[in-house]
């Protein structure tokens, strides 16, 4: 079993499979290229062809870029596995998919066994790719459902949660940043992400104003008492209110205003790249990977969990640490935290609360024991 193969390796392997009618490179990079087209009975025209392109753009926008990239990798891995077994991924075969899931879980190849959540995500990616090609994958088919149920029963483990970044931690992290342009930007990212309980993709997709760019994931309105972020999030459009802090050193809105002022940004992406010397803001929007790297770098520099080896410290913290930190630190009614994080249920919010009082309601005593 092969895992996380490079693009070049995929292309060379695809080229080697001359007997296969399946062009993996095209399928991987354009998974929905044939999903939308003119009916065979309709003659093409310039107007209709343009509408097909427009419809394809909307179809791609149905999922986030990160999700699409993950689904593309899922399909590439499954397609290569099929070729290695002398099979074709098209049309869908529940029997082959059941064997594939078993291979992922057993770790019988050179790569280690995958977690249940990763296997479940792989299956979702494969099903999505089949749907884009006009096929339906029945996940309830016994060859798939029973194998997956057995994998979950045998290998399921409690989810490994990332460490929450608490208020004292975020202050120590921003204290490691310089006061050049790049430092102002990164300080704003950390404070805004923490106070808003934002996902890293939500942070970098923000624009200054509504409809500034085609790829916008939302915009910011700065007011006297704080800022309102309108986000096109996983659960749909939502508003996040971020109030001003108790001091300029810790205020996310002040940090944002400082960054926008000195970077001379009044239109387009809020968080952009800077020149090598950190003195000039460029036009290119930051990647969400920058947020993850920023968190890990500042965690190390600030000495958080210094008693642990560096490798363990890096593994403990991620973009989700900001969201978990807000949920764990904010001493307010749970429903306000739930709204801020955009959770559909209070139970999901509680999963983010790393230090909540689990025994505030003691049913043992309430039952008379």
Language-model segments: which ranges?
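Basic/aromatic DNA-contact patch characteristic of tyrosine site-specific recombinases
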Residues: 1-91, 99-102
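N-terminal core-binding DNA-recognition domain of tyrosine recombinases/integrases
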Residues: 52-66, 76-159, 176-179
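Flexible interdomain linker/hinge and immediately adjacent N-terminus
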Residues: 138-175, 233-235, 276-283
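Basic, Lys/Arg- and aromatic-enriched nucleic-acid-binding interface segment
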Residues: 168-200, 204, 252
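C-terminal catalytic core of tyrosine-transesterase DNA break-rejoin enzymes
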Residues: 191, 321-344
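Conserved tyrosine-mediated DNA breakage-rejoining catalytic core shared by Y-recombinases
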Residues: 205-253, 257-261
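Active-site/catalytic core of tyrosine-dependent DNA strand-transfer enzymes
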Residues: 245-312
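Catalytic-site neighborhood detector that most strongly recognizes the C-terminal catalytic loop/helix
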Residues: 341-366
């Amino acid at each position: 079993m092969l895992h996380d193969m490079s693009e070049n390796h995929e292309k060379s392997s695809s080229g080697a499979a001359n007997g296969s009618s399946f062009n993996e490179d095209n399928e991987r990079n354009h998974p929905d290229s044939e999903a939308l087209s003119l009916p065979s009975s309709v003659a093409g025209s310039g107007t209709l062809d343009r509408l097909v392109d427009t419809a394809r753009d909307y179809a791609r926008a149905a999922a986030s870029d990160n999700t699409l990239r993950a689904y593309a990798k899922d399909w590439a891995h499954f397609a290569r596995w099929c070729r290695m077994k002398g099979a074709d991924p098209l049309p869908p075969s529940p029997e082959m998919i059941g064997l594939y899931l078993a291979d992922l879980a057993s770790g019988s190849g050179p790569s280690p066994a995958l977690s249940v959540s990763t296997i479940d995500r792989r299956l979702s990616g494969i099903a999505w790719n089949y749907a884009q090609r006009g096929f339906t994958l029945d996940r309830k088919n016994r060859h798939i459902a029973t194998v997956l149920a057995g994998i979950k029963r045998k290998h399921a483990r409690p989810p490994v949660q990332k460490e929450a970044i608490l208020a004292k931690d975020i202050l120590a992290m921003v204290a490691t940043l310089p006061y050049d342009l790049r430092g102002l930007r990164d300080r704003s990212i950390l404070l805004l992400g923490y106070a808003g309980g934002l996902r890293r993709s939500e942070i970098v997709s923000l624009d200054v104003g509504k409809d500034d760019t085609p790829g916008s994931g939302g915009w910011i309105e700065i007011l006297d008492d704080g800022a309102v972020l309108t986000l096109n999030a996983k659960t749909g459009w939502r508003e996040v209110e971020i109030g001003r802090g108790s001091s300029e050193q810790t205020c996310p809105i002040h940090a944002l205003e400082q960054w926008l002022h000195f970077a001379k940004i009044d239109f387009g992406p809020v968080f952009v790249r800077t020149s090598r010397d950190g003195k000039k803001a460029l036009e290119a929007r930051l990647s969400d990977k920058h947020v993850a790297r920023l968190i890990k770098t500042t965690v190390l520099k600030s000495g958080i969990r210094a008693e642990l080896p560096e490798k363990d410290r890096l593994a403990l913290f991620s973009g989700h640490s900001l969201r978990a930190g807000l949920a764990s630190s904010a001493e307010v009614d749970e429903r306000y935290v739930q709204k801020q994080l955009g959770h559909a249920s209070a139970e999901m919010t509680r999963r983010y609360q790393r230090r909540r009082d689990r025994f505030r309601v003691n049913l043992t005593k309430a039952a008379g024991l």
